[in-house]
Amino acid sequence: MPELTTAPGLLALVGLAAYLLGAIPFGLLIAKLFGLGNLREIGSGNIGATNVLRTGSKPAAAATLILDAGKGAFAVILARVLVGEDAAQIAGAAAFLGHCFPVYLKFNGGKGVATFFGTVIALSWPLGLAAGAIWLATAYTFRISSLSALMAALMTPIFAWGFGQRELVVLSLFLGFLIWIRHRENIIRLLSGTEPRIGAKKR
């Protein structure tokens, strides 16, 4: 973490605002807008872009991906411009937590992968690109979204350390740990060989 130079009260307000932004369930809203039905009753029941893709609508999945990543990036950039770097990291973490545990959905949200990428790339674009490269390489090789996310989450703090961005190591460890926790059912399916591949419709 960077040195905390901002007043704690202001950091708390930044965190609350970022959390409420991150908690917006864009996947659910887009699925309804596209007439795809209740996303909670489709595929895995998750509200993220991967599950939206299982409806067969690539435009809806792309829109969900962009908006879920965008809320993390927007929270970071706005906090950085208005307050400072310490607030930017708080905002990124809070937006991620909002997506995973949204107050609007009784704290039952998504797995945070897109918001993770949006947050990381806004905090450090080289780190975000490196994490994205790991996701793409794993997805290309194995065609499994969850495995790609897990590998990217695992490697991001290692990249942060290697790039000399020590102030991002703790945050990326925290976010990566939560991604692994949120993917615990996927990990079980990966170990049993039953995890669906990208584009597969899970019924």
From Swiss-Prot:
Catalyzes the transfer of an acyl group from acyl-phosphate (acyl-PO(4)) to glycerol-3-phosphate (G3P) to form lysophosphatidic acid (LPA). This enzyme utilizes acyl-phosphate as fatty acyl donor, but not acyl-CoA or acyl-ACP. Belongs to the PlsY family. Probably interacts with PlsX. Keywords: Cell inner membrane, Cell membrane, Lipid biosynthesis, Lipid metabolism, Membrane, Phospholipid biosynthesis, Phospholipid metabolism, Transferase, Transmembrane, Transmembrane helix. Its EC number is 2.3.1.275. InterPro entries: G3P_acylTferase_PlsY (IPR003811). GO terms for biological process: phospholipid biosynthetic process. It is a multi-pass membrane protein. GO terms for molecular function: acyl-phosphate glycerol-3-phosphate acyltransferase activity. It holds the Pfam family G3P_acyltransf. It catalyses: an acyl phosphate + sn-glycerol 3-phosphate = a 1-acyl-sn-glycero-3-phosphate + phosphate. It comes from the Bacteria. This is Glycerol-3-phosphate acyltransferase. GO terms for cellular component: plasma membrane. It is found in: Cell inner membrane. Pathway: Lipid metabolism; phospholipid metabolism. Its main location: membrane. The chain crosses the membrane at residues 10-30, 59-79, 87-107, 116-136, 168-188. PANTHER family: GLYCEROL-3-PHOSPHATE ACYLTRANSFERASE-RELATED (PTHR30309:SF0), INNER MEMBRANE PROTEIN YGIH (PTHR30309).
